[in-house]
Amino acid sequence: MDSDYNGSGLYAEGEERFGSIGSRFYGITRLIPTLRRFYSFVLRDVASYDYGSVLDVGSGTGFMLLSIAGSRENFRGLGIDPSPQMVARATSRSMKLGLNDRIAFRIGSSRSIPGNSNFDLIYSSLSFHHWKDREESIRSIMDRLNAGAHFVIYEITDDGSFNRKFVKSHLMSRQKFEDISSRLNLQADIKEENGYIRAAFKK
């Protein structure tokens, strides 16, 4: 895909778009205590899977994929995001960490995954709640999994705490994931922990 492509065609109608300001903001969200605990939850769970190739859908500034790469060496990873600004920041961070020989970032989306490679693990962290056509996206992603591989979604749930009141539209629930998996005729392995949720779909 052309590196000059602006990614505008990869957003579905109504999906939130992230430019230079948004990408800078997301670069500091890892400092927020709730999100630090969320990232720890994701890292622990990802470590339970066996994989040699990983795709991060909605990789943003690359924090999660690069964190995984920093703790595990024997895999190659690709992060995709429809925001060129996010991809640029992630690529720069990968190069500074010396991980760009095995971790790459490209413009793409859940419905438009660049290349033709399949993956041992595909995951999304704090991106799924933005997707407007979730079922189409899951179908597209499942097609890019190797046999026996997993697509894993990590999100935040409503744990009743005060701060959740301000981000209702960004929250997922067990019921939402169960409804989606039922419509797609897929089995979802759902795990909840301290206000965070993981839904895993196996090919």
Per-region residue spans from a language model:
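N-terminal, positively charged/glycine-rich alpha-helical extensions of SAM-dependent methyltransferases
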Residues: 1-23
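C-terminal alpha-helical "lid/dimerization" subdomain adjacent to the S-adenosyl-L-methionine
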Residues: 5-10, 152-201
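Class I SAM-dependent methyltransferase Rossmann-like catalytic core
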Residues: 20-33
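Conserved alpha-helix/loop element of class I SAM-dependent methyltransferases that forms part
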Residues: 33-50
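Class I SAM-dependent methyltransferase SAM/SAH-binding core
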Residues: 55-57, 61-111
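Short conserved loop adjoining the S-adenosyl-L-methionine
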Residues: 112-116
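A conserved beta-strand element that flanks and buttresses the S-adenosyl-L-methionine
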Residues: 123
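A short glycine-rich, Lys/Arg-flanked "PGG" loop and its adjoining helix->strand segment in the class I
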Residues: 136-147
